[in-house]
Amino acid sequence: MRVSNMFFQTLREVPAEAEIASHQLMLRAGLMRKLASGIYSFLPLGYRVFRKIEQIVREEMDRAGAQELIMSALLPAESYQASGRWEVFGAEMFRLKDRNGRDFCLGPTHEEIFTETVKSVTRSYRSLPLILYQIQTKYRDERRPRFGVMRSREFVMKDAYSFDRDEAGLDISYKKMYDAYCRIFDRLGLDYIIVDADTGAMGGSDSQEFMVKSAVGESRIAYCEACGYAANDEKAECVPEKCCDDKECCGELGLEKVATPDVRTIEELMQFFGCSAKEFAKTLIYKADDKVVAAMVRGDRELNETKLQNLLGCIELEMADAETVEKVTGAAVGFAGPIGLDIDIVVDLEVAEMKNFVVGANETGFHYKNVNINRDFKPKYVKDIRTIKEGDACPKCGAPVKVEFGIEVGHIFKLGTKYSEALDCIYLDETGKERPMIMGCYGIGINRSMAAVIEQNNDENGIIWPISIAPYHVIVIPVNTTDSVQMELAEKIYTQLGEMGIEVLLDDRDERPGVKFKDADLIGIPIRITVGKRAGEGIVEYKLRREKDFAAIPYEEAIAKAKKEVAEGLKK
């Protein structure tokens, strides 16, 4: 491709709305264009990368024995109503009615549709196991789209679904997809970690995420270097710190009510009482669907809303507003406590280990000290509802865990019979008995994977694409397009590389060399061959994007090196 014929435009300035490297570079390099909040169009250069990621995914899915199809993105409400997820998705689902008033949605995910399709075709155990997949656009009305295609309202996913006779069969299908995902992300050149995860609205039992460590990731990963345990913070188990073993120290003291005027926050309480945050228990008031509940964690801990939501089984969970807090507790925000509270109370495991702690008194300007669980109040649930943090004990081996941010690029689930039972997707076993199919679900975000690659492969000059998904492998840059000797050699190199099957650009624009070099670096072409003043000698400059130095070598050697580099890059 000649650059003079390409439909693209690079930007020198960083767009104001772009906060992270991948978003900035995808806009600056002319890979995509914003249409609206969370909605983007891919331009030719970006779409070439996009298609290559799709192709790698497709090749590995086919290699694992999965069969590709394509489902509609416009889906009838009845399918989601049958599984109960029409309500579960809440405001995140794009809903619409046709001219006859029938409810539809733009598909946020396709479990129900795949299940119904298999149900209509497959009836015998002889047809199982079965793995189907599609690469299709999804729609979710994100509350706050951000970071470009990292969290958008329209995105492309590869979603696959396995159907098996039993749990043993599901284990085999799950392992096939697990291995396929490892090969996919290896070929994309990603440095990733596999973590245990929450199943969320998808339902089911076991779940794992493929995470790319990144400071701009929206997920937090807890992992143990000692034993290999890894989970996202929604799933990571928290080991409660025990109260001290000194029975005299931990004996129950008498409950005291203390005046604490204008003392609301943990920091203010620490100063007032002269003790650490570990001696306080926060009482947080939440709205869980149509109920109000209280949740308690230690003063130095953060509540994990996903764990709380899963425990309560609610669709919507949000912090109560000040009016609700005052109505339920009889006090202003900052003075809520469990004693005398006439709502369900959920206590974190760590709070259950505490003795003689401080809580709000449900009276503005007052707190209780020497509070003890069961004596002074009785919780409905005692469960792990806090968020793990750096240095906490690993739930498997007890060593300190590390916590980092990550980008989720893939997610695999064991769904079991959640959808097959709800949608009556059954098969006849060897004895003629009806049994529900055992399902698995496997997703990869194509857009997000593209952004994740950029997050891990960039520098101050632009993107550094792995050869496997680069829009073009090589760019040939003649320094002076009016010099016939330079242009003749550049054309020769361009032609020979193209005949070898190498994807090559020829920057034949009448631009300054500096502009061409900056564009090549910004776009991230892996190999640059510059044809300059020594063209008459057959000498060119050969440079890899990931390296700073270049080599002045004969053009034949440059062609051979490019061929070898591309072959090795595509082999990985």
UniProtKB/Swiss-Prot annotation:
Gene3D superfamilies: Anticodon-binding domain, Bira Bifunctional Protein, Domain 2, YbaK/aminoacyl-tRNA synthetase-associated domain. GO terms for molecular function: aminoacyl-tRNA deacylase activity; ATP binding; catalytic activity, acting on a protein; proline-tRNA ligase activity; transferase activity. CDD domains: ProRS-INS, ProRS_anticodon_short, ProRS_core_prok. One of its GO terms (biological process) is prolyl-tRNA aminoacylation. It is found in: Cytoplasm. Keywords: Aminoacyl-tRNA synthetase, ATP-binding, Cytoplasm, Ligase, Nucleotide-binding, Protein biosynthesis. Consists of three domains: the N-terminal catalytic domain, the editing domain and the C-terminal anticodon-binding domain. Catalyzes the attachment of proline to tRNA(Pro) in a two-step reaction: proline is first activated by ATP to form Pro-AMP and then transferred to the acceptor end of tRNA(Pro). As ProRS can inadvertently accommodate and process non-cognate amino acids such as alanine and cysteine, to avoid such errors it has two additional distinct editing activities against alanine. One activity is designated as 'pretransfer' editing and involves the tRNA(Pro)-independent hydrolysis of activated Ala-AMP. HAMAP family: Pro_tRNA_synth_type1 (MF_01569). This is Proline--tRNA ligase. It comes from Acetivibrio thermocellus (strain ATCC 27405 / DSM 1237 / JCM 9322 / NBRC 103400 / NCIMB 10682 / NRRL B-4536 / VPI 7372) (Clostridium thermocellum). The lineage of its organism: Bacteria, Bacillati, Bacillota, Clostridia, Eubacteriales. The gene is proS.
